[in-house]
Regions:
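Substrate-binding clefts and catalytic carboxylate motifs of secreted carbohydrate-active enzymes
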Residues: 125-131, 137-406
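Active-site-adjacent substrate/metal-binding segments within catalytic domains
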Residues: 1-142, 185-189, 203
Length: 406
C-alpha cells in the first residue's frame, strides 16, 4: 500500500540533500537550514533523504516541527572505497588520503558509529526510514558485472531494460563472486545493529543493481528496498516480490520518474536528486558543484523546481521560460507539433532542458516559449495579442506546453 501516515496513504515527494550550504561551507547554520527546508516545502516537497551521511540534529528538529519526513542515511561506503569520482570520472590515480573515506575506519568504528547515530535520532518523529548505505554495489564489481544491463559506469547501469533471466544472472554472480558475497554479509550485520537499537522503523538502503541484489541476499535483510535510478524495475519486481515494500531512493528530476510512481499505490514515492545544488560532482571549471536541483546554491528556484511544483502542488501555477529554437532540443514540425531530440551523453538524464527566464531577443530570432503548469489549458498573449490556447493533455510526453514565436 505504499507509505501510510496515521493510517492515510501519503505519496512521498522527496529530495536528496547534501549537508553543505554552498559558499557557507558545511557548518550547520540553523537560519540557512530552515530557509532551505521552507523553500523545499513551498514547492510541495514533503520528505528528504540525508545523502549520504548523518546530518545535524537541528535539521531533524526542524523537520519534526515542519512535518517533513526523513530517510535518515548512515554512510556512502562500507568496507571497500568507491573512488569513482577520482578513478572513473577524473581518470586519475589519487593517494589514499583523498580517495578513501570511511572505509579505513569501518571495521573498528562502524558498529559504534551506527548505533550512536540511531540513538541520537530515534526519538525524532520525522524519521521514517533508516538507510544503511548507498549504491554499495559499485564497490563490488561482481555485482554490476553479473547482469547484462549493468556493464560499467557512465550511466549504462541506469538505462538498461529490466533483466528477468534470474537463472543466468545468479549463475554469473556465483562464478564472479567465487561463492562468497561480502556485501550481503555486511548488510546483514548493519541491519542487525540497527535492530539492536531501534525496531520501530524499517531498514532500507539505496540499491543500484536490483536485478542482482534481489538474488544475492542483499535485499533480504532490508525491510524497504530503495531503488536508485531503476524506475523500469518497479512493476516487475513488485510482481516478483510483492511482500517487500519499495521506494525510489534516488531519482533524476525528470517527469518519467514521477509518472512511474504517481499512480502506483505499492510504491511509497521518490527522492529526487537533488533539492539544492551541492559542492562536489562538478563539471569543468568554473563549476563548483552539482546543478541538477530544484534550487541553486543561493536558493533561487530553478526551471526544474518550477516544473515539479506544478506536479506536486494543486495550487494553480504557471511558469514561462524561453529559448531560441536553434539552441533547443525541441523543434517545431510543419504540422505544428514538436519533436524532441536529446543531447547525446549519459549525463543528459540529470540535466534539465536549456531554458532562460527572460524575454529579450532579436526580431529575426525564432523563439520557443515553454509553459509549465498544472492548469488544464493555457492561453499565451504577446503584447496583448493572443497566440492561442493549448491544452496540457496534448503535451503529456513532456508536460510542457509550447509555442513558437517568429
Amino acid at each position: 500500500e505504499g507509505f501510510l501516515l496515521n493510517g492515510k496513504s501519503v505519496k512521498i515527494k522527496g529530495v536528496n540533500i547534501h549537508h553543505d550550504l554552498g559558499c557557507m561551507g558545511v557548518a550547520a547554520y540553523d537560519d540557512a537550514l530552515l530557509r532551505r527546508l521552507l523553500k523545499l516545502r513551498s514547492i510541495g516537497c514533503n520528505a528528504i533523504r540525508t545523502a549520504h551521511n548523518p546530518h545535524s540534529e537541528s535539521l531533524l528538529e526542524m523537520c519534526d516541527s515542519l512535518g517533513l519526513l526523513v530517510m535518515n542515511e548512515f554512510i556512502d561506503e562500507w568496507k571497500v572505497a568507491k573512488k569513482k569520482w577520482i578513478t572513473e570520472r577524473a581518470k586519475e590515480d589519487a593517494p589514499d588520503s583523498i580517495s578513501i573515506g570511511y572505509t579505513r575506519y569501518f571495521d573498528t568504528h562502524a558498529e559504534h558509529d551506527l548505533k550512536s547515530f540511531i540513538r541520537r535520532d530515534r526519538n525524532h518523529p520525522c524519521v521514517i526510514l533508516w538507510s544503511i548505505g548507498n549504491e554499495i554495489e559499485w564497490t563490488y564489481p561482481y555485482y554490476w558485472a553479473s547482469s547484462k544491463d549493468n556493464k560499467g559506469f557512465k550511466g549504462l547501469i541506469h538505462t538498461g531494460d529490466p533483466e528477468t533471466d534470474n537463472k543466468s544472472i545468479l549463475k554469473e554472480f556465483n562464478r564472479l563472486s567465487g561463492g562468497k558475497d561480502d556485501l550481503a554479509e555486511t548488510a546483514a550485520v548493519l541491519a542487525g545493529w540497527v535492530k539492536d537499537v531501534d525496531t520501530t522503523r524499517p531498514v532500507s538502503s539505496g540499491v543500484v543493481v536490483p536485478s542482482v541484489s534481489r538474488l544475492s541476499g542483499y535485499t533480504d535483510v532490508l525491510d524497504v528496498v530503495g531503488y536508485n535510478y531503476k524506475d523500469k524495475y518497479y512493476e516487475i519486481d513488485h510482481k516478483l516480490y510483492p511482500y517487500q515494500p519499495i521506494i525510489g531512493s534516488e531519482n533524476v528530476g525528470q517527469l518519467f520518474e514521477w509518472t512511474a510512481v504517481a499512480d502506483k499505490k505499492y510504491i511509497a514515492g521518490i527522492f529526487v536528486w537533488t533539492g539544492f545544488d551541492y559542492l562536489g560532482e562538478n563539471g569543468p571549471w568554473p563549476a563548483r558543484g552539482g546543478d541538477c536541483s530544484f534550487f541553486d546554491f543561493v536558493g533561487n528556484k530553478t526551471a526544474r523546481g518550477h516544473f515539479f511544483e506544478c506536479l506536486w502542488k494543486d495550487t494553480p501555477k504557471t511558469h514561462i521560460v524561453t529559448i531560441p529554437e536553434k539552441e533547443s532540443e525541441f523543434k517545431m514540425d510543419t504540422d505544428g507539433s514538436f519533436t524532441y531530440t536529446p543531447r547525446p551523453g549519459w549525463i543528459r538524464r540529470w540535466e534539465w532542458y536549456d531554458t532562460r527566464d527572460k524575454w529579450k531577443y532579436r526580431r529575426d530570432e525564432d523563439i520557443l516559449v515553454q509553459v509549465y503548469t498544472n492548469a488544464p489549458e493555457v492561453e499565451l498573449f504577446l503584447n496583448g495579442k493572443s497566440l492561442g490556447t493549448k491544452k496540457r493533455s496534448d503535451f503529456m510526453e513532456h508536460n510542457i506546453l509550447m509555442w513558437k514565436v517568429a
